[in-house]
Amino acid sequence: MVHNAYDSFQLLKDCPARIDAVESYGSKLFAGCYDGSLRIYSPPESSASDPSELHQETYVLEKTVAGFSKKPIVAMEVLASRELLLSLSESIAFHGLPNLETVAVITKAKGANAYSWDDRRGFLCFSRQKRVCVFKHDGGGGFVEVRDYGVPDTVKSISWCGENICLGIKKEYVILNTANGTLSEVFPSGRVAPPLVISLPSGELILGKENIGVFVDQNGKLLQTERICWSEAPTSIVIQNPYAIALLPRRVEVRLLRSPYPLIQTIVLQNIRRLVKSNNAVIVGLDNSVYVLFPVSIGAQIVQLTASGNFEEALALCKVLPPDESSLRAAKESSIHTRFAHYLFENGSYEEAMEHFLASQVDITHVLSMYPSIILPKTTIIPQPDKMVDISGDEASLSRGSSGISDDMESSSPRYFLESEDNADLESKKMSHNTLMALIKYLLKRRPAVIEKATSEGTEEVISDAVGKTYGANDSSKSKKSSKGRGMIPLNSGAREMAAILDTALLQALLHTGQSGAAIELLKGVNYSDVKICEEILMKSKNYSALLELFKSNSMHHEALKLLNQLADESKTNQSQTDVTQIFSPELIIEYLKPLCRTDPMLVLEYSMLVLESCPTQTIDLFLSGNISADLVNSYLKQHAPNMQGRYLELMMAMNDTAVSGNLQNEMVQIYLSEVLDLYAAKSAQQKWDEKDHPPERKKLLSALESISGYSPQPLLKRLPRDALYEERAVILGKMNQHELALSIYVHKLHAPDLALAYCDRIYESVTYLPSGKPSSNIYLTVLQIYLNPKKSAKDFAKRIVALGSFESSDTTKMMDSVLSSKAKGGRSKKIVAIEGAEDMRVGLSSSTDSGRSDVDTEEPLEEGDSTVMISEVLDLLSQRWERINGAQALKLLPRETKLHNLLPFLAPLLRNSSEAHRNFSVIKSLRQSENLQVKEELYKHRKGVAQVTSESMCSLCNKKIGTSVFAVYPNGKTLVHFVCFRDSQGMKAVSKTTHGRRR
């Protein structure tokens, strides 16, 4: 630890008088002697050295100033900024330099024993007996007394501390406030050694207590817990950064002024009387000789310390190198940190070693060269260190040359499997773990800057590509690795190559130390890990979660999804380990695909087919929540999974039916119809088809036909069988506004008056059924016509069905026979006469929609005698929906032989309602007439009003006379205003209201 910070040189010897004080002025040396004389020494005249510094050569006597002082000179100090020499003898005197003429003598300082000079302000303080005096230099040759203070005891040591003064008196240290003269105690001084106050360049103080130096600020507050400890109690201390030099009874000690304040050098000299700081050295005054301590250059000291292994002291000295040598300082610090790091690493202080590697800013590959178990990209040039520690251990199963080694060779290696070396293996494992943990901390600290630089470099490259300045589309010099995503690192990219080295090494270190979770978090963020190396390591260690994140971070989605599918299959067949079966499931594929819906929908569709059967609901939810085009999904499902197409469309309709296009609605209804047709074909083959039976497939189709509005009914109608699915046909015809045909099916084919009534109610209540110019109650009249004239309705049914293209015209005869031969429901059925002349039916309707026409509209008489009227259904309809049917039109449709008492349930409420409405209208008419009379009467009263205008009448708004101007009168009949003023005021109110409304 000890080295030579100073070289001791005897400047003069054999002085004829005892030397009590020494000082330097430029290259000259002043020696104040016991006899009061001042001897001036200088280097030989032949010396050509710098005249402003002391020289390392024997000085010769230049001049003796006899009688310089009447008494022995106690102390001297050169005030270089003012070209003055201060001397303390019987009093304090100031002499001009270089001629030493007396400038001023402070007579009040007679008997002074200590002083302190503040060069910045030109203030002098000194102690005399129990007084402290302060004088100020007036800038010329005089001094002005500022103030005189009283103190409790004789002052042994004194020093300025800012604008206050620190005093070391007999028993304690105190701070004297020069503004008000108050004293503040600091702490007691030592019992044996006298007080010692030393000022530091920073303005702080060192206060001596026996052999300990205590650091305090300018207010006397303790600064730190550390203390500087000397071998003995010093009598004087000189500060020369970065050292503190203390004068001890038999030697001079040099200590580093930095915790823990180690001893640097000891210089043994006898009879030392004075220790004085010079501009470039430290002067040591003996009885009859003078030694000078010349500082060794900082660079030489650093070399000494580094060679001896004192790296911390060497680094501390680097801090004090001159600012103009910043490059040299950085180089030295880096070199020392590197050597120190190697030393610490070899001695087992791995974390501390990494701190110094970090401070040295050495290349990452230099540190990684000490870890042969870490595999790096092949393009990396690895430096060979002087000494490398093999920290591979059992965890580091991969090394730079191990990828081709067989299992047999590994198992035959005695390094791992010799039973006699179990303890050595345990120590090796512990060492490996500790070294890798230290490496992880080092890499994590280096990583942010490296990643930021790599990212910015990548951004600049993208911008350059965009503007076409750097990389052309056919640039053959641009070589890249054949990988994807962030793993794609150009070989000429220094920052990204370094990032790849760092992340690859960091990932391996995390895995070797069992930190799989941290490795996964690393891969989730921005990383530049080498894909090939990391994939091999992760596959070998079966760390599939990290491997998936590696693929994901490098946009290798195909590889990731294949791996997930493989793991899911293994978990099903129980071929993998228990933990794998618990972690990996088909749902993970869905979770992986979710973020890809926006960027790569075709990839999502491709791999979703792997889990569609095992997780249908989650997969379809993926399609719906991923904002993938519904048409694209439907087309893909139709081609690759037609059995799931309907389920997808169902869920989509359930989520938001308004967002489903008409094409998809058509698809869904067609799928439902296909299912029902398949069911119909199967049951018809077994002769088990029942038109009244409603299995789930048929219920689903009917519900879709009724609730969905965007499908095209015409193609569906053509797919229906001729002699089945009548209810579906009725719903489809209703969607085509062929209400008469739909009702004919309900009445004649299904024999379901209740369904016909429900159909009418649905149409009546629907806002879509509002034919132009005709009331919505026509739908009930339509069903009445069907009930009252089944022959005609059957004939129209056959004609219009053929016109719609639902059947071939050759089938209409059979269809009409089927209609007319049907029996009514519930015992009311009667034989309906067969329709004659069906072969004469002509195809042709001018309109494809049913306008809801009735016989009343066309004034066609009912055909009687050939058909049986369904009178009971008619009467039920009239009694149940009397309020929705036009009574007059309904009565016209009824047969003449209808009994009046059968119409009572219809006519009674109808007449009551009509009478009540008539009475209500009469009351309303009377009220309106009365209100009209009241308004007329009030108008008459207002017109009878009289306003008296005289020559003195004033306008209430402008306060001017009305005169002959047009005027207005307010409703109270008294307030008169000009009509112009009234109009303007109303306009202002209107503007105000408009503005207020806009603000709100």
UniProtKB/Swiss-Prot annotation:
Biological source species:
Arabidopsis thaliana
The cross-references to InterPro entries, in alphabetical order and at most eight, read: CNH_dom (IPR001180), Vam6/VPS39/TRAP1 (IPR032914), VPS39/TGF_beta_rcpt-assoc_1 (IPR019452), VPS39/TGFA1_Znf (IPR019453), WD40_repeat_dom_sf (IPR036322)
GO BP terms in the entry: autophagy; protein transport; vacuole organization; vesicle-mediated transport
One Pfam family linked to the record: zf-Vps39_C
| One GO CC term on file | HOPS complex
Protein name (database record): Vacuolar sorting protein 39
Q: What are the CNH domain coordinates in residue numbering?
A: 16-282
Gene deleted: what happens?
A: Defective embryo arrested at cotyledon stage. Heterozygous mutants produce some yellowish seeds with developmentally retarded or abnormally shaped embryos. Conditional dexamethasone (DEX)-inducible mutants exhibit altered vacuolar morphology showing fragmented round vacuoles.
Family stated for the protein in its record? Belongs to the VAM6/VPS39 family.
